[in-house]
Regions:
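Active-site bordering "gate/hinge" segments
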Residues: 1-374
Length: 374
């Protein structure tokens, strides 16, 4: 059997040597960065694949070692700009656990609400960039982005998270506007979901990730759940206010592991997040006024320790290994990011896939390039 090699460029990697440039459109986050795929082809079928990362290294982990803990929260959302709030929140939760800090109840519910809004906006971009018919949903996403900007001051990088809570509360008018936008999204989502599902059925059986491969690689989030791995930290761990919302957490799972299954799971988690966000907003209204952070010393020092924290972000499970020697900066803060494993899973799933299905295969693994090379 005679095979040939092909180097595929994604995003800014098109400026390097390449045999094929894969254009995913201006909207898809995988296009914002640089990634190469080294493919082995037999006629028009992929028989081998290797993801070449390292072209957009964010140096986040090294920068953390030279920043104090407050400054780290301002940097923590830079490597995955799609899951920005969840990224800074995961770091804050890890620091708080190491210091024994318990945020106020209003802060916990506000964080839960913002985390679900972040999950919705991330999912909507991945859905809206999938097929042209789904782009109409991006108008609703734009309204959610404007609400985030009103609440945090940052459209892309919220930077509202503080050690022990949030920088400012979410006011009643903001909660009312959020309810209006979520109602609009609930109304428009079924038609968009149908358009995406119909378009992706053409790729049934392509880029299949088996359950065993998903487990061995350590994939999480919607990619893992589309391969039969029923894991979700919101349901399985006592994080934020999720234990009180347990009855509302319906985790969509599929066993097919192919392109349509991944989009099915991604679409399925949006209504769940809408329900959780609405429930969190109702609870905040019931709580009324109250503090959203705790007093901190001028210099924050984490006691000498090694600790590990996790959070379920829009793309999957993020892990934070914090090693402190009692100084105002960490000795090491290592990130375990979902995009890194998702790209490894992409390479594992491609053999047997027609080259014509490469673009939807890549977009169905839901990654941000900066989150790979952090």
């Amino acid at each position: 059997v005679t095979t040939r090699q092909a180097l595929v460029a994604i995003g800014a990697a098109r400026h390097l040597d390449a045999d094929l440039v894969l254009d995913l459109g201006d909207l898809h986050p995988a296009q914002h960065g640089a990634l190469q795929l080294a493919l082995e082809l037999d006629d028009d079928v992929i028989v081998g694949a290797d993801a070449r990362v390292g072209l957009l290294h964010r140096s986040a982990e090294k920068l953390f070692e030279a920043r104090d803990y407050r400054q780290i929260l301002m940097l923590a959302n830079r490597h995955d700009w799609l899951s920005a709030f969840s990224s800074e929140l995961g770091v804050a939760l890890t620091i708080e656990a190491a210091m024994g800090i318990v945020p106020p109840e209003r802060a916990t519910w506000s964080r839960t609400l913002l985390a679900e809004v972040n999950r919705i906006t991330a999912s909507l971009l991945l859905v809206g960039a999938a097929v042209p018919e789904a782009a109409q949903i991006l108008g609703v996403r734009e309204e959610l982005q404007e609400l985030q900007e009103r609440a945090t001051g940052g459209r892309v990088h919220p930077m509202i998270t503080r050690i022990g809570g949030l920088a400012r509360p979410l006011d009643a008018r903001w909660l009312d506007d959020l309810a209006r936008v979520l109602a609009l999204l609930t109304d428009r989502l079924p038609a968009v979901g149908e358009a995406v599902t119909t378009a992706m059925q053409a790729y049934a059986g392509c880029a299949v990730l088996t359950t065993d491969d998903a487990l061995s690689i350590g994939v999480s989030g919607p990619v893992a759940r589309a391969s039969g791995v029923d894991l979700d930290l919101r349901r399985d761990a006592a994080l934020l206010a999720y234990p009180e919302l347990a009855s509302l957490i319906d985790v969509p799972v599929s066993v097919a592991g192919d392109i349509p299954a991944r989009y099915e799971v991604l679409l399925g988690q949006i209504p769940v997040s809408i329900t959780l966000a609405c429930a969190s907003a109702d609870r905040l209204r019931a709580l009324g006024e109250g503090p959203v952070n705790v007093p901190l010393p001028k210099v924050v020092r984490v006691p000498e320790s090694t600790s590990y924290g996790e959070f379920e972000g829009p793309l999957g499970r993020s892990g934070y290994l914090l090693s402190s020697i009692g100084e105002k900066t960490p000795w090491r803060l290592k990130l375990r990011t979902p995009s890194f494993t998702n790209v490894q899973a992409l390479a594992r799933s491609l053999p047997g896939t027609p080259i014509a299905a490469l673009a939807p295969s890549v977009t169905s693994f839901f990654f941000v390039v900066g989150d790979i090379d952090r």
